């Protein structure tokens, strides 16, 4: 059975442009208006999407997208700051406690260990011993000088004035003459008559000493008398006592 010629609805749909061209067929154009829609869609899709997808090729977008690159590159500045903050190398300089921990300077017992150095260090104390010897010598010299002065003083006082060690002797002959004169002198003496044979101290020179005495024998008017003579000082001044 035959009908009007046209597309068979039982045949599968073919997109426009494939198979026979029915655009000039009024029946198809009127009875199947939906077939023009794909043509319109194809015609619409060509200009519509093409400029939209070509816009990313616009150089304005690449200029906008690279901007974040320097913007995001700023974290590198923040990343650099941690580098500055993380300069613990400066804090790491606290490893300088190695300077404190240089036990080699403290623990060099080699400088302290050699006992031979200690006697060398005690050597200066030996110099103090020399100083003590010098002080002893000085003290000894002072004592010697003082001793010399003392001895000199003793010698002066003993042999010169008042002459403790000097033994002054009175000439016994002069002493006898002096005793006879005192006995016979009528003004300053006893005014005795016939005074003779005066002998003193058994003929020995008496020692002059204050308070010392010596005895003299004398004959007065033929009578033997004894006279005591006393030294008044260390110079030889004497006093003749009354004849007895």
Curated annotation (Swiss-Prot):
GO cellular component, one term: plasma membrane
Intracellular or extracellular location(s): Membrane
Membrane-crossing residue ranges in chain numbering: 136-156
Pfam family membership, one: DUF4333
UniProt region (Disordered), positions on chain: 1-127
Chain intervals with Low complexity compositional bias: 45-75, 88-127
InterPro entries per UniProt: DUF4333 (IPR025637)
Biased composition (Polar residues): 34-43
Domain of life of the native organism: Bacteria
Membrane topology per record: Single-pass membrane protein
Keywords on record: Membrane, Transmembrane, Transmembrane helix
Residue pairs linked by disulfide bridges in the UniProt entry: none
UniProt main location, coarse: membrane
Name assigned to this protein: Uncharacterized protein Rv2091c
Organism: Mycobacterium tuberculosis (strain ATCC 25618 / H37Rv)
């Amino acid at each position: 059975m035959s009908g009007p010629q046209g597309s068979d609805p039982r045949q599968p749909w073919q997109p426009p442009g494939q198979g026979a061209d029915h655009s000039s067929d009024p029946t198809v154009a009127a009875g199947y208006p939906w077939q023009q829609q794909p043509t319109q869609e194809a015609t619409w899709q060509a200009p519509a999407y093409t400029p939209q997808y070509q816009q990313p090729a616009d150089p304005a977008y690449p200029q906008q997208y690279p901007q974040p690159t320097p913007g995001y590159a700023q974290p590198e500045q923040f990343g650099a700051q941690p580098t500055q903050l993380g300069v613990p190398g400066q804090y790491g300089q606290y490893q300088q406690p190695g300077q404190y921990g240089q036990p080699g300077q403290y623990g060099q017992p080699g400088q302290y260990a050699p006992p031979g150095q200690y006697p060398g260090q005690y050597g200066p104390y030996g110099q103090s011993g020399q100083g003590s010897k010098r002080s002893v010598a000085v003290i000894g010299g002072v004592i010697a000088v003082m001793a010399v002065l003392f001895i000199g003083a003793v010698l002066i006082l003993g042999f010169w004035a008042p002459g403790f060690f000097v033994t002054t002797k009175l000439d016994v002959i002069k002493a006898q003459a002096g005793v006879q004169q005192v006995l016979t002198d009528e003004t300053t003496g006893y005014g005795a008559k016939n005074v003779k044979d005066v002998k003193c101290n058994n003929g020995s020179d008496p020692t002059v000493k204050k308070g010392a005495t010596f005895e003299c024998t004398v004959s007065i008017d033929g009578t033997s008398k004894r006279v005591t003579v006393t030294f008044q000082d260390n110079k030889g001044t004497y006093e003749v006592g009354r004849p007895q």
